[in-house]
Design a protein with these regions (language model features):
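N-terminal signal peptide c-region/cleavage motif recognized by signal peptidases
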Residues: 18-20
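Edge beta-strand at a domain terminus
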Residues: 109-131
Length: 131
């Protein structure tokens, strides 16, 4: 192998690692809320997280919970706009992976901070009404 193709190969590999679409792959997939019957689908390629099931509010299916998802310098952290249900609006949030199967949204409002944990699931189970 000559030097030029090796340099080209290294450049291509570096570019692939730096692509935004690959940056959030660790977040991609289905997540269940820590205490509520709510499931979301995190889609790093679109920078969004969509509600795919909500047993208490089925009318919210399809609602964007996460928008503007972006990587940060930390390998296990991202920033995004997250819908804060109690406030009824999107707020800037930090999203972290505390483990491979645990995701945490942290929203700060003034001096207050609230964190919500999500657990990774392989699929979204059918809703009780669908069974």
């Amino acid at each position: 192998m000559t030097r030029l193709p090796l340099k080209l190969l290294l450049l291509m590999l570096s570019a692939m690692v730096a692509l935004p679409g690959n940056a959030g792959d660790e977040l991609a997939g289905y997540w269940q809320h820590e205490s509520d019957p709510v499931w979301i689908d995190i889609q790093p390629e679109t920078g969004q997280g969509v509600m795919v099931r909500n047993d208490n509010r089925p009318d919210r299916i399809g609602f964007l919970i996460v928008t503007d998802l972006e990587t940060s310098d930390d390998h296990n952290a991202w920033s995004a706009q997250v819908f804060a249900a109690r406030l009824g609006e999107y707020r800037k949030a930090e999203i972290t992976l505390s483990a491979d199967d645990r995701m945490v949204f942290t929203v700060k409002v003034g001096f207050m901070r609230r964190s919500v944990e999500w657990r990774r699931v392989s699929e979204v189970p059918p809703a009780p009404n669908d069974a």
